[in-house]
Amino acid sequence: MLVRGLPLRSVLVKGCQPLLSAPREGPGHPRVPTGEGAGMSSHSPRPFKEIPSPGDNGWINLYHFWREKGPKKLHYHHFQNFQKYGPIYREKLGNVESVYIVDPEDVALLFKFEGPHPERFLIPPWTAYHQYFQKPVGVLFKSSDAWKKDRLALNPEVMALESIKNFIPLLDPVSQDFVSLLHRRMEQQGSGKFSGPIIEDLFRFAFESITNVIFGERQGMLDEIVDPEAQRFIDAVYKMFHTSVPMLSLPPDLFRLFRTKTWRDHVAAWDTVFSKAEQYTEKFYQDLKQKRHFDSYPGIFYRLLASNKLPFKDIQANVTEMLAGGVDTTSMSLQWHLYEIARNLRVQEMLREEVLAARRQAQGDTSTMVQMVPLLKASIKETLRLHPIAVTLQRYPQNDLVIRDYMIPAKTLVQVSIYTMGQDPTFFSNPRRFDPTRWLDKNKDLTHFRNLGFGWGVRQCLGRRIAELEMTLFLIHILENFRVEIQHLNDVDSTFGLILIPEKPISFTFWPITRAPPQA
């Protein structure tokens, strides 16, 4: 029974016992020796069916899952299963069977054997929509050589470290405009500060950022009057995520067959995403054909066209996926980050001091400045530890694999519970504490295969560099201009809406630095 009055997250973490009973090594972030945990054993491994499990009937399991917590608490379901079964277990929900692991050493082994063309779990309703309506797909849905071809063409423009310098002039003005937006909100409230939720503004900020990086042109989403068609796209992405959850364990074709509201809303959301993305790409394609010379970086879309490595339809499909994936994910991460620094004012001041010092030393050069804020970058990792966007990472091993002395057959879905990993004292000392400095420890064993917020390896998040830079610049400008407080210090619980989102709106108070109230 849960303690009355405490949110579920608090009860779970406060009562959390280390998942592994073997003695640990190292201060703060102990690790399992490979031979003891993840390694191959000298004797025959135990069969797959002996992996701890609630039972093999997926429909009975699904019934209990829906009855007890349901999909909105999927991350807590994983957490409690690890508490019950240990560091590895298998579960079949509906027609989806997975093996779940959590120890970083086991994760390292999984990724070591992921193969040259890693495969991950495809979200069933997304796949169903694309197949039923014969929509073009990008790297999110492709596999094998088709995936590799697209990814090799995209990486130099999206993932290469040197590409960051091209993104800064496009992303930095958007962050500056967000500061201006908050000042306008203060003037409207007339109290010398702004108090209220900002998630809708963060959605628009993220959309403005990703479209500017891709197309090299602003959409005006931080103005007082915004384009209603662009707002439709933002709303559609949110609905597309939200309506996916009920169809994760039940076949989407069942929802389609009975024309449920969930399926109809999901289709309408995807239709809007594709329609608007097609309009954007066609418009900018025609504009670019008229213009051959650019005085500055023209955006990812033009660079992909100019490279001539992919046909237009593949560029269009990948741009659509980047647009759809670049709104809710980044905005939610920023909201969680503001939530944590508003609750931890000492950390906020440490971050502010680092940012102000970096600004002075860089003498106004933003490219130099973003290289001089290691604590700020560590704070982003820390936010993603406590509030990961995805609750698991998934892989289908190419060959048979032995983890914890259990044989896992090739092509079995293996899920890494990064939410549980981030909450467990076995892997992070004082896991409930927001402590960015833990990521700055020079002992690499302390962070070994723990920083998984953007995935890992060749199939990590395609938009990682954009998102990291976007969040870094945003937080730099917020910390330079405002002291951020939260109106209620009680824990805000999270809910699973395909990504982890706050269970209730978070209201912040932004004080201009010159008017910030004295610290206690």
From Swiss-Prot:
The protein's Enzyme Commission number: 1.14.15.6
Keywords: Cholesterol metabolism, Heme, Iron, Lipid metabolism, Membrane, Metal-binding, Mitochondrion, Mitochondrion inner membrane, Monooxygenase, Oxidoreductase, Steroid metabolism, Steroidogenesis, Sterol metabolism, Transit peptide
Quaternary organization: Interacts with FDX1/adrenodoxin.
Binding site for heme: 461
PANTHER family: CHOLESTEROL SIDE-CHAIN CLEAVAGE ENZYME, MITOCHONDRIAL, CYTOCHROME P450
Domain of life where this protein originates: Eukaryota
Residue stretch of the organelle transit peptide: 1-39
Entry GO CC: mitochondrial inner membrane
Disordered: annotated span: 19-47
Subcellular location: Mitochondrion inner membrane
Membrane topology of the entry: Peripheral membrane protein
Protein's organism: Equus caballus (Horse)
GO MF annotations in UniProt: cholesterol monooxygenase (side-chain-cleaving) activity; heme binding; iron ion binding
Enzyme class per UniProt: oxidoreductase
Protein name per its UniProtKB record: Cholesterol side-chain cleavage enzyme, mitochondrial
Metabolic or biological pathway, per its Swiss-Prot or TrEMBL entry: Lipid metabolism; C21-steroid hormone metabolism; Steroid metabolism; cholesterol metabolism
Family label: Belongs to the cytochrome P450 family.
Known role: A cytochrome P450 monooxygenase that catalyzes the side-chain hydroxylation and cleavage of cholesterol to pregnenolone, the precursor of most steroid hormones. Catalyzes three sequential oxidation reactions of cholesterol, namely the hydroxylation at C22 followed with the hydroxylation at C20 to yield 20R,22R-hydroxycholesterol that is further cleaved between C20 and C22 to yield the C21-steroid pregnenolone and 4-methylpentanal. Mechanistically, uses molecular oxygen inserting one oxygen atom into a substrate and reducing the second into a water molecule.
Pfam families linked to this entry: p450
InterPro entries hit by this protein: CYP11_CYP27_families, Cyt_P450, Cyt_P450_CS, Cyt_P450_E_grp-I, Cyt_P450_sf
GO biological process, one term: cholesterol metabolic process
Cofactor(s) annotated in UniProt: heme
Reactions that this protein is recorded to catalyse: 6 reduced [adrenodoxin] + cholesterol + 3 O2 + 6 H(+) = 4-methylpentanal + pregnenolone + 6 oxidized [adrenodoxin] + 4 H2O; 2 reduced [adrenodoxin] + cholesterol + O2 + 2 H(+) = (22R)-hydroxycholesterol + 2 oxidized [adrenodoxin] + H2O; (22R)-hydroxycholesterol + 2 reduced [adrenodoxin] + O2 + 2 H(+) = (20R,22R)-20,22-dihydroxycholesterol + 2 oxidized [adrenodoxin] + H2O; (20R,22R)-20,22-dihydroxycholesterol + 2 reduced [adrenodoxin] + O2 + 2 H(+) = 4-methylpentanal + pregnenolone + 2 oxidized [adrenodoxin] + 2 H2O
Organism lineage string: Eukaryota, Metazoa, Chordata, Craniata, Vertebrata
